[in-house]
Amino acid sequence: MFSREMNIADFDPELANAMANEVERQEHHIELIASENYCSPRVMEAQGSQLTNKYAEGYPGKRYYGGCEHVDVVEQLAIDRAKELFGADYANVQPHAGSQANSAVFMALLDAGDTVLGMSLSEGGHLTHGSHVNFSGKTYNAVQYGLDKETGEIDYAQVEALAKEHKPKMIIGGFSAYSGIVDWAKFREIADSVGAYLLVDMAHVAGLVAAGVYPNPLPHAHVVTTTTHKTLAGPRSGLILSSCGDEAIYKKLNSSVFPGNQGGPLCHVIAAKAVAFKEALQPEFKAYQQQVVANAKAMVSVMQERGYNIVSGGTDNHLFLLDLIDKDITGKDADAALGAANITVNKNSVPNDPRSPFVTSGLRIGSPAITRRGFKEEQAKQVATWICDILDNMGDESVIKRVQSEVVALCAQFPVYK
């Protein structure tokens, strides 16, 4: 039998120390990685529950194991809340991650070798949208679209031209590094013109969509996938949604998730999703998402005033790309310099980037995490000022030390977990 007094620190101090150091890092660093966020203690409680012990292959009411009556309730709660949150007719809460959700959709709707049309990774897409290093680019014939070189927005004319030329079986909308509003209706129009499925990967903007501050792709896409962390602020996991009304597609999706791509679901993570979905249904969640966008816009305004180039000219969501080509600063060096000052970002390729993905000429910056800890426009502008100070004085240790001290002081005023 296990005593509930058992803990990691007494048994494995080396691991406990690493975990404690990560807690300290999160509290004393400003987190600007657009795909990261802080989940609530309720979400972490669910993930650390005894539900982790239960195997439950199958779906609620149709399991391959006994003793699933309680996890059936848990999963159905998550399904029902996901449907309510996004206005969906169908929801599968079992995918372990966004990539697994995308893989399941590919397997459900395509055959190996079929053509897919997705956004280029170097222009803001995701690995699973047809990158040659990913299953989506290895198993399928991937064609890639990008941004209009003049406006920095999605080049819908190119999407349409490529669709007519290559006749893809599926078109993918969505992104990992694009700061504009996507015209989901236009994507569906193009998909219908060539008889293609439309898959929308809304992983980055799911929280914004749930709160009604970003267009919902459900009325337009055949299938929508997402992660459940990022702007949604839940556990690190995946979700498949649809409102297409085609029961045959829903059946294919379920079979593709299990047994096609996965075995048993992670019941403790599904419980955490159920909690996160209920949190996202609360009125304060909309206010949070509105502040996420306001903070991103505030940061952009400061950086533009300081002479920095923002891809697409600004932001309408939670993230933006800082183009450093004209500053002759690599994304790798900028990332390291900011990290030394307790500001965490990620290097990112920018359109027409002359440098490799391991070096890059840009930074991706996001506001979900700083907003989650309570930052408003005032603090967001201060953070942007610090970033510019460091980038304007690359290699100046005195600037880094000064900013680091000020960052720690600000973080102390806005603890993540009190």
From Swiss-Prot:
Its cofactor is pyridoxal 5'-phosphate. Disulfide bonds: none annotated. One of its GO terms (cellular component) is cytosol. PROSITE patterns: SHMT (PS00096). It is found in: Cytoplasm. GO terms for molecular function: glycine hydroxymethyltransferase activity; pyridoxal phosphate binding. (6S)-5,6,7,8-tetrahydrofolate binds at residues 121, 125-127, 356-358. One of its GO terms (biological process) is glycine biosynthetic process from serine. It is an enzyme of class 2 (transferase). Keywords: Amino-acid biosynthesis, Cytoplasm, One-carbon metabolism, Pyridoxal phosphate, Transferase. Belongs to the SHMT family. NCBIfam families: PRK00011.1. PANTHER family: SERINE HYDROXYMETHYLTRANSFERASE. This is Serine hydroxymethyltransferase. It comes from Alteromonas mediterranea (strain DSM 17117 / CIP 110805 / LMG 28347 / Deep ecotype).
